Amino acid sequence: MEAGKSAEDVFNISRLYLYINDKAILKDITIKIPNNSIFGIMGPSGSGKSTLLKVLNRLIEIYDSKIKVDGKVLYFGKDIFQIDAIKLRKEVGMVFQQPNPFPHLSIYDNIAYPLKSHGIKEKREIKKIVEECLRKVGLWKEVYDRLNSPASQLSGGQQQRLTIARALALKPKVLLMDEPTSMIDIVNSQAIEKLITELKNEIAIVIVSHNPQQVARVADYVAFLYNGELVEWGSSNEIFTSPKNELTEKYVIGRIS
């Protein structure tokens, strides 16, 4: 399949192998992730989905020092391992499965803090960005009158939307999302899915999910991983209506999980 010209690809992953303690966790992964798209990575637990996600902004280096990477991962044509990790993570934001706001900071400061840490000091600009991001994730009307309250007082779903707002505050080019709705209620899950589809007009989104139905609802492109290997990838329509591999078909219809 053609995923667009190389200049349009956010990530170009070629023959990627990842070893932790000499054990192969990812094996021969080759994928292109186009810009301004939603790219879904699905597969059963232990298939390497979250590990692949953490490679894309080099968080894997924080989680485990005994790693070895073979192959290439290009970010807008540049080797990610030749890019300063802090700069890369500013441009490639991440939202985790477990909502992780700074619990002892206020709702406002959860977004303001990273802005200040990256050199934005003007209060008026910070206030503007905070409001913009809260509006974008649909939280503003729910929290505008208690911005100084601790983030820990929010519900789990609200906390997850706050962490998305925090990630968006730094204006990333890519947002990585690792099972972002698996631990929250259905109302907030639906709000986040709607947000994801809206955000692709601005940035690329890579979402990991063990839920094929969710991937089918939101993704433009899909990769199916199994036991650390890429089974196949293509457009969402191709993967869900005419998969080339029998294993993919079994996963999509729920015969393996």
Swiss-Prot record:
Domain ABC transporter: from-to ranges: 11-252
Keyword Amino-acid biosynthesis: no
Keyword terms, alphabetized: ATP-binding, Cell membrane, Membrane, Nucleotide-binding, Phosphate transport, Translocase, Transport
GO CC list: plasma membrane
Keyword RNA-binding carried by entry: no
Primary enzyme class: translocase
EC number: 7.3.2.1
Family: Belongs to the ABC transporter superfamily. Phosphate importer (TC 3.A.1.7) family.
Reaction equation(s) it catalyzes: phosphate(out) + ATP + H2O = ADP + 2 phosphate(in) + H(+)
Gene3D superfamilies with a match to the protein in the record: P-loop containing nucleotide triphosphate hydrolases (3.40.50.300)
Primary localization class, coarse: membrane
The protein's assembly and partners: The complex is composed of two ATP-binding proteins (PstB), two transmembrane proteins (PstC and PstA) and a solute-binding protein (PstS).
Reported function: Part of the ABC transporter complex PstSACB involved in phosphate import. Responsible for energy coupling to the transport system.
InterPro entries: AAA+_ATPase, ABC_transporter-like_ATP-bd, ABC_transporter-like_CS, P-loop_NTPase, PstB-like
Residues that coordinate or bind ATP: G43, P44, S45, G46, S47, G48, K49, S50
Subcellular location, record wording: Cell membrane
Alphabetical list of PANTHER family matching this protein: ABC TRANSPORTER I FAMILY MEMBER 17 (PTHR43423:SF1)
Topology relative to the membrane: Peripheral membrane protein
Record-given protein name: Phosphate import ATP-binding protein PstB
GO molecular function: ATP binding; ATP hydrolysis activity; ATPase-coupled phosphate ion transmembrane transporter activity
Disulfide bonds: none
Any one Gene Ontology BP term: phosphate ion transmembrane transport
